[in-house]
Every structure is written in C-alpha cells, then in structure tokens.
Amino acid sequence: MPRGKSKSAGKVNNMGDMIKRLNKKYGMEVAHDLNKENPTEVKGWIPTGSRWLDSIICKGQKAGIPIGKISEIAGLSATGKSYMAACIAAEAQKQDIYVVYFDSESAIDPAFLSKAGINTDPNHFMYIQAITVEQVLEMIEEFLGAEQRILFIWDSIANTPTDSDKEGGFNPNASVGKKARTLSLAFQKLTIPLANAECTLLCLNQL
C-alpha cells in the first residue's frame, strides 16, 4: 500500500511538471489543473446598463456580457447599438477595465461618449479608426500582450472592409466571402487568448 501511494504521488508531480512545460512551450495557459481553476468559467460580467436586458441575457441573473468572451450586438441601422455599446463601456470602466473603441463609421464623438458616462482620458480609453478587418484583428492580438483587462468594441463589422476590398474597385463580387472567412478564422484564433487575458470583444453588426 505505501508503495502504491508513493507511485501515485509521483505521477501527479510529473503531470504537474507537464502542465508547466506545455504552458511554457506554447506561450500561454493551455493546460490546467481543474482542481485549482476552471478555464471555461466566466471570470466576471459587464452590465449593459439595463437590468432588464442583463436578466434576459443571463437567465435571471443580473449580470451582462461575459468577461473574456466574444459577444455581438446585432440590429437594424439606427436602433441604438452604438449607444448600448457605449453604456457597456462605461460600466466596464467602473471595473477598471480599459476600453478600446474601433470605429469604422467615423460617427463617434466625445460628447456622445461622455453622455454615456465614458471617461475618454487616454489612461482609460482609446479611440481607433477601423480601416480594415485585418488591421483591427492584428491590433487586438497585439493588445492582448499588454497584461491589462480590456474591452474591445468593434463598431461595426459590417462597415469595416477587408484589405482586398480596400485595395480593389467597387465590384461587390470581387471579394465575396473573404470577410466571413477572415472573421471565422480570427475568432477561432482569438477565443482562448481573450479568455486567458480576461479581455472582452464586443462586436456590433447590422442586420
């Protein structure tokens, strides 16, 4: 019996070392001890500013959008998507979460942000013009190395062209499906790094 216990303990130690080795090799937390942490557990929530909406999203819990995840606000044009995103940003700042706002429509101004309760000081907020889909995604990936909880707001996906759209002409068929493929790959690539960094991506889209 004592030998069995010793052998079992050795295996646990070896696997503990393996977790460290894997995480070091891949440069991020990919292997976990579920007795210590659950990587799929939501670390926190950012309220939307509407307790009624929060309770619907979270099945009765007054929460909001999940930290470390990718969320989307979709709706028709001029239905208040940007204002809701701004309200979420203001709530995020209350939790000491930095806000990065990607604007593809050049429609956001400081007065609008202040009305929603956002602190636009550069120590708390950064405004970036969304030139192309690829540039936005590359910048998000770069921000993830900042060791800072960040809320990324992308306003909006629909109005952000791809690199090929920007460089090409005005033929809508020239790059059919390129944006969808790029976003699909990017979201797969960003899902785990966002969760590990406790950063949140809120995408706005038009129906």
Where are the language model's segments positioned?
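The Walker A/P-loop phosphate-binding site
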Residues: 3, 7-122, 140-145
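Short amphipathic alpha-helices and their capping/turn segments at secondary-structure boundaries
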Residues: 137-152, 190-191
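Loop/turn-to-beta-strand initiation segments
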Residues: 96-98, 123, 148-151, 196-203
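Conserved P-loop NTPase nucleotide-binding/switch module
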Residues: 151-196, 203-207
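Conserved P-loop NTPase mechanochemical-coupling segment
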Residues: 120-130
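Intrinsically disordered, low-complexity linker/loop segments enriched in Gly/Pro
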Residues: 93, 102, 125, 157-158, ...
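Amphipathic alpha-helical transducer elements in NTP-driven molecular machines
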Residues: 12-15, 46-50, 54, 67, ...
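Switch/connector loops and helix/strand junctions flanking conserved nucleotide-binding motifs
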Residues: 108-112, 135-137, 160-164
